[in-house]
């Protein structure tokens, strides 16, 4: 069986940080999303979705929202592994109820192929030093799954996904 973040009939709020995923999933006239959609900056996908989820809980508790919503957000590897990690870590540590998907292509591809901590060791990017002494990025790739699992959350998974974004 397939694990799905959303099922037919679910009502969702979807967040998406600026990056390759945001650009590739909102091509006119076919957007991948039919639910409420929030576009946010590279670094604040975790903060945005945790804030929306908190507001939802407060409004539901007051009886102003009757429907049950699910929350899912997307971030690129740069915005997840690096510049947005603190907001994601905080949201996980506080126990917010959401699904986070990292669209990882191994570098800041949307802004010119700069290295991120998701870039594999020895990979060349536009920020790799040049010359015969350079063997590419000298650091190992961050083990994000292990770092996220250390937050004692219910589930961490990794996959290679090459299908239709609407199938996610």
Task: Report each predicted region and the residues it spans.
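Glycine-rich ThDP/TPP pyrophosphate-binding loop and its adjacent helix/strand module
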Residues: 62-71, 82-98, 103-168
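Short hydrophobic segments within beta-strands
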Residues: 15-17, 74, 101
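Secretory-pathway/luminal and periplasmic proteins that interact with or process carbohydrate-rich
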Residues: 26, 80-83
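Short glycine-rich loop/turn motifs that provide flexible caps or phosphate-binding loops at active sites
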Residues: 50, 75, 83
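A near-ubiquitous, low-amplitude feature marking generic local secondary-structure context
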Residues: 25, 31-35, 74, 131, ...
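Thiamine diphosphate
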Residues: 1-69
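Active-site metal-binding loops of divalent metal-dependent hydrolases
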Residues: 19, 76-79
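A general structural-boundary detector
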Residues: 35-38, 78, 135
């Amino acid at each position: 069986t397939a694990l799905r973040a959303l099922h037919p009939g679910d009502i969702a709020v979807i967040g998406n940080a600026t990056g390759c995923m945001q650009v590739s999933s909102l091509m006119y006239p076919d957007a991948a999303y039919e639910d409420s959609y929030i576009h946010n900056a590279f670094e604040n996908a975790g903060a945005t979705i945790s804030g929306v989820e908190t507001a939802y809980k407060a409004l539901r508790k007051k009886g102003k929202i009757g429907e049950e919503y699910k929350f899912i957000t997307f971030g690129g590897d740069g915005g997840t592994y690096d510049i947005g990690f603190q907001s994601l870590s905080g949201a996980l540590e506080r126990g917010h109820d959401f699904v986070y998907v990292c669209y990882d292509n191994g570098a800041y591809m949307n802004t010119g192929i700069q290295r991120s901590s998701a870039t594999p060791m020895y990979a060349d990017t536009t920020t790799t030093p040049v010359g015969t002494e350079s063997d590419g990025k000298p650091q190992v790739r961050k083990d994000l799954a292990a770092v996220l699992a250390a937050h004692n959350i219910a589930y961490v998974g990794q996959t290679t996904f090459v299908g239709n974004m609407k199938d996610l």
